[in-house]
């Protein structure tokens, strides 16, 4: 089922357009509030399912916050993973190569692998595994060396459809600032 590509990309592009037309930070906050209210609840409940489910009981089961909202977030993470320039090139390549065609997530990601030179096969696990990972961050400041060490630990919940969740790649952007 490739609905997650069509709808995830549509939601992502709508969010980006809205951010360009308004205040980008305010729009992002609104998008995240909606994601946390709708999709996180779905991912943490009995109806948790992958963004690209292998099967479904009813066609209505496909039109969910996971397919739309989480699908958009996966594209946003892809942009972070490959960088803005490679993302733009990958998107241009995707439209040039596949406009008007029925395509798969694999076709979509192949364009970004080609544009960025990165292997994104591990990243595709996001489409097959339900649940919302939790990141726990701890930091340690070494006064003597002036070094900040940030340690991130990911935990993935079991869901009704996945009793053995695996770690998922998560692109992270971080910055540190001095007091002055």
Label each residue range with its predicted role.
Residues 119-121, 130-180:
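Beta-strand-rich binding/interaction modules
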Residues 1-141, 150:
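Hydrophobic alpha-helical and helix-loop surface patches within well-folded domains
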């Amino acid at each position: 089922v490739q609905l997650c590509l069509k709808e995830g990309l549509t939601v992502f592009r709508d969010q980006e357009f809205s951010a360009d037309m308004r205040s980008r930070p305010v729009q992002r906050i609104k998008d995240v509030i909606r994601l946390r209210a709708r999709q996180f609840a779905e991912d943490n409940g009995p109806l948790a399912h992958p963004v690209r489910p292998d099967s479904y009981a009813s066609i209505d089961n496909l039109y969910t916050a996971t397919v739309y909202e989480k699908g958009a977030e996966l594209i946003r993470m892809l942009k972070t993973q490959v960088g803005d320039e490679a993302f733009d090139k990958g998107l241009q390549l995707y439209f040039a190569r596949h406009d008007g065609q029925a395509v798969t997530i694999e076709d979509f990601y192949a364009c970004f692998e080609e544009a960025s030179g990165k292997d994104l096969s591990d990243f595709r696990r996001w489409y097959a595994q339900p649940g919302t990972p939790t990141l726990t961050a701890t930091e340690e400041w070494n006064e003597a060396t002036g070094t900040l060490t940030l340690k991130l630990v990911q935990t993935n919940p079991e869901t009704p459809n996945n009793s053995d969740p695996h770690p998922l790649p998560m692109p992270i952007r971080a910055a540190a600032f001095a007091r002055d």
